[in-house]
Amino acid sequence: MVREEVAGSTQTLQWKCVESRVDSKRLYYGRFILSPLRKGQADTVGIALRRALLGEIEGTCITRAKFGSVPHEYSTIAGIEESVQEILLNLKEIVLRSNLYGVRDASICVKGPRYITAQDIILPPSVEIVDTAQPIANLTEPIDFCIDLQIKRDRGYQTELRKNYQDGSYPIDAVSMPVRNVNYSIFSCGNGNEKHEILFLEIWTNGSLTPKEALYEASRNLIDLFLPFLHAEEEGTSFEENKNRFTPPLFTFQKRLTNLKKNKKGIPLNSIFIDQLELTSRTYNCLKRANIHTLLDLLSKTEEDLLRIDSFRMEDRKHIWDTLEKHLPIDLLKNKLSF
């Protein structure tokens, strides 16, 4: 059936989700095809996407737990079936869904006897638990049990040195890897000069995002990696010239908005969405979290407003500046702005 759909190598490159299912709350599966590809291209794309999916997708997890006066992680607490180490391992397995950046606080505070599950975690509004039935501990006696938690969004596997903290807090090895597994296979079709390849890509995720969302994020990350090479020829500058390249100082978006409103061309700012501005995935996500969706939303913010956004850096500010400079009319760029 696939061979009939891909008749020749001259056909436009297309992708399609051919299978999608939810095996459990913490196991999503998706199967995608990309075709038609020339010989060797399927392997190139498959390797790049697999690496990006397994190592470049961001995830949210619990990174620290504070128990109070507990001497070490191998201690046992009266009235609790599990040891501190077992509780830490259970917390490590909790799957969270969120777009937050930076560190956030959470907590558990319950009274026994009862089972403690992920549903008992008190989270900030921006964080959601994927599987509320995940076990944490079993209180066998009528005791008060409270834990302070730290939550962080990151990528990859982060480990911390084990040491005793005076305040009773213990680090949890963070596994910020929403994609559990990726497989790809290649099928050759056609004859002679019309021979081409079809890439099949299988993605399993932990439920914090769908395979389609993971594929989208991995693709954006790969595009961001190659953007500097695309812009190098446009800039027409050598490496020596780049050393002394001017970095714009602090600027005020409000002034630029005023200049835009005076522009005779009447640009429909509310019709230009930020995903049309070729922003990096990091800058794009920062703006989306701040409910900035259009160019009008962006230019309505002062620089102070932007710098207050979680994880918004000076590099993001410069990237936005360069993007606006690229997309705004030339006559507007000649206007004097307040710095």
UniProtKB/Swiss-Prot annotation:
One of its GO terms (biological process) is DNA-templated transcription. The keyword Transcription applies. Its EC number is 2.7.7.6. Coiled coil: none annotated. It is found in: Plastid, Chloroplast. SUPFAM superfamilies: C-terminal domain of RNA polymerase alpha subunit, Insert subdomain of RNA polymerase alpha subunit, RBP11-like subunits of RNA polymerase. It is an enzyme of class 2 (transferase). The keyword Nucleus does not apply. It catalyses: RNA(n) + a ribonucleoside 5'-triphosphate = RNA(n+1) + diphosphate. Residues 1-233 are annotated as: Alpha N-terminal domain (alpha-NTD). Keywords: Chloroplast, DNA-directed RNA polymerase, Nucleotidyltransferase, Plastid, Transcription, Transferase. Its main location: plastid. Residues 264-339 are annotated as: Alpha C-terminal domain (alpha-CTD). Pfam families: RNA_pol_A_bac, RNA_pol_A_CTD, RNA_pol_L. One of its GO terms (cellular component) is DNA-directed RNA polymerase complex. CDD domains: RNAP_alpha_NTD. In plastids the minimal PEP RNA polymerase catalytic core is composed of four subunits: alpha, beta, beta', and beta''. When a (nuclear-encoded) sigma factor is associated with the core the holoenzyme is formed, which can initiate transcription. NCBIfam families: rpoA. Belongs to the RNA polymerase alpha chain family. The N-terminal domain is essential for RNAP assembly and basal transcription, whereas the C-terminal domain is involved in interaction with transcriptional regulators and with upstream promoter elements. DNA-dependent RNA polymerase catalyzes the transcription of DNA into RNA using the four ribonucleoside triphosphates as substrates. This is DNA-directed RNA polymerase subunit alpha. It comes from Aegilops tauschii (Tausch's goatgrass). The gene is rpoA.
